[in-house]
A protein has these predicted regions:
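C-terminal interaction appendages of subunits in large macromolecular complexes
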Residues: 3-6, 10, 14, 18, ...
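Residues forming anionic-ligand binding surfaces in small-molecule and nucleic-acid pockets
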Residues: 51-57
Length: 532
């Protein structure tokens, strides 16, 4: 069963108290709690849109919700813009309702408490326009150069929901499994703030290592938005406009109910004051009647008959001690009564004027912003690009070797060091029966290899897709990489630095010559669109 309520405690922050403000004024409906012993609110009055600001995550039967957190100040700015638009539409019905795009000028993107960077804006746009979207979040990572010239990656913020200890372990496992190379050490120097140091080897490229960390670890993760919430008891998928509109509608209902409550209390107090003013104006006679009466009920009845009071007024007089009653000052009572009349007039105007109610909602939102808003923590990179495989590899010089039997590999040029006089050379591959090196070619890691076969076919391979091997390794069968047809064989190949360089491919040519002496010259552009 449910735990006893006495075991459930919470220390509320100042902002959390704003969620409960005016709950005592009959602003929301109440329902019985789990054991029907107490009543609890169906929803909180909440002076700010908590669902947007703090987000939500949960699973129910057949559905789930996952809403990101937002910056309080930005959300309130969006709500104020919605309110201003609503007022304009009251004054001029031809004004169009505020759009999601216009709200996004204020509510720019989710803002996570752990900071990080939203990488790319399409997911945010999808989430705000449709209620569903996939938002990419990157950690804050900076490359620093130490005094000794070595580089290191400093991680200062993590994507929302990422557990730091799990991340560090994952990176260590990838290094041990050789899936990420170039890392010499990892240290967690975090105290109050996150600070994880990744030491980079001298011969490694820190940017390439960081790109691999983004790809293979939670340094880059995604937040899948699914904005489902209960609206009048029914689950609905909400876009940004829907969420803001429902909040403002809720606040309008709260303001109306609070105003009616305040009006009722003000009228009740004014009614009592009318009786007290009559009593003080006739204080001697009132005291005489009370003293002459045998019971409070008799005193009430006598006062009602003599001064035309009703039961509430006479009871208020009789319930006061005579010392209190005689101490009342007529001017103070009249001043309080006059102020109450002004309040009653204002509250009635508020109930009868929708524009004034919107003004109240706007002012209360601005008050919350001035008290509690802070700076955005999560940065936004709108024009982010998808991962380019080239980002995973440094553009190093490579030696490409193809054997007589069709085995291919790439080897870093640095393995073929310069030798002095009398050197015996360096083997590009280990000798094997019936096989030998037939082609040796130098290319950069980001270059594209173009393979031409005896049957006139062309195949493309990026250099980084060619398996790396040392000088003794065999390599991989080229036929398994480019699916050469049976009986066909590579007869020539070249490498091109960048097939996307239009000026280059338009002004360079390939010349073909056949065994029968035929030749042709074709622009490189004709071969610059690789097919899978």
């Amino acid at each position: 069963g449910a735990a006893a309520m006495r075991y459930t405690e919470a220390r509320l922050s100042k902002l959390a108290e704003e969620m409960l403000r005016d709950i005592e004024k009959d602003t929301v409906d109440m329902q019985l709690n789990f054991d029907d012993s107490l009543k609890e609110p169906v929803v909180l009055p909440c002076r700010f849109p908590n669902l947007l600001v703090n987000g939500a995550s949960g699973i129910a039967v057949g559905m789930a919700t996952n809403m990101p957190t937002h910056n309080l100040g930005e959300v309130i700015d969006g709500c104020v813009a919605y309110v201003k638009n609503a007022v304009e539409r009251i004054q001029n019905p031809e004004v169009e309702p505020i759009t999601v795009a216009e709200l996004m000028e204020h509510i720019k993107a989710p803002d996570f408490p752990t900071g990080g960077t939203i990488y790319g804006y399409q997911g945010v746009r999808d989430a705000y326009e449709t209620g569903r979207g996939r938002i990419i979040i990157r950690s804050k990572a900076e490359i620093e150069t130490e005094d000794n010239g070595r580089e290191r990656i400093v991680i200062g913020e993590l994507p929302y929901g990422v557990v730091k200890s799990d991340l560090v372990k994952n990176i260590a496992d990838l290094v041990n499994d050789k899936k990420i190379e170039g890392i010499s050490g990892i240290s967690d120097q975090s105290k109050r703030d996150v600070r994880v140091i990744i030491e980079i080897k001298r011969d490694a490229n820190a940017q390439v290592v960081l790109n691999k960390l983004y790809k293979y670890t939670a340094l880059q993760s995604s937040f899948s938005v699914n904005s489902i919430a209960l609206v009048k008891g029914r689950p609905m998928l909400l876009n940004l406009h829907d969420m803001v509109a429902n909040f403002i509608e809720h606040r309008m209902d709260v303001v109306i109910r609070r105003t009616k409550y305040d009006l009722r209390k003000a009228e009740e107090r004014a009614h009592i004051l009318e009786g007290l003013i009559i009593a003080v104006d006739n204080i001697d006679e009132v005291v005489r009647i009370i003293r002459a009466s045998r019971t409070p009920a008799e005193a009430q009845s006598n006062l009602e008959v003599r001064f035309g009071l009703d039961n509430l007024q006479s009871k208020a007089i009789v319930d006061m001690r005579l010392s209190q009653l005689t101490g009342l000052r007529i001017e103070e009572l009249k001043q309080e009564y006059a102020k109450l009349q002004e309040l009653i007039q204002y509250l009635n105007e508020l109930l009868n004027n929708e524009t004034k109610r919107y003004e109240v909602i706007e002012n209360e939102l601005i008050e919350i912003k001035e008290k509690y808003a802070d700076e955005r923590r999560t940065r936004i990179i709108k024009m982010a690009t998808e991962f380019n495989p080239e980002d995973m590899y440094a553009d190093d010089d490579m030696v490409i070797t193809i054997s007589h039997l069709g085995y291919i590999k790439r080897t870093p040029l640095t393995e073929f060091r310069q030798q002095g006089r009398g050197g015996v050379g360096a083997k590009a591959s280990a000798a094997r029966d019936e096989d030998f090196i037939e082609y040796v070619h130098q290319a950069n890691m980001h270059s594209t290899m173009m393979f031409f076969t005896e049957q006139g076919r062309l195949y493309w391979i990026k250099v980084y897709d060619i398996p790396e091997g040392n000088r003794q390794s065999k390599g991989r069968a080229l036929q398994n990489m480019i699916n050469i047809q049976k009986g066909d064989k590579v007869c020539a190949f070249i490498h091109v630095k960048n097939l996307n360089d239009q000026e280059y491919v338009d002004n360079h040519y390939l010349i073909f010559a056949t065994k029968d002496g035929l030749m042709k010259k074709t622009t490189l552009e004709s071969y610059s669109r690789p097919r899978a």
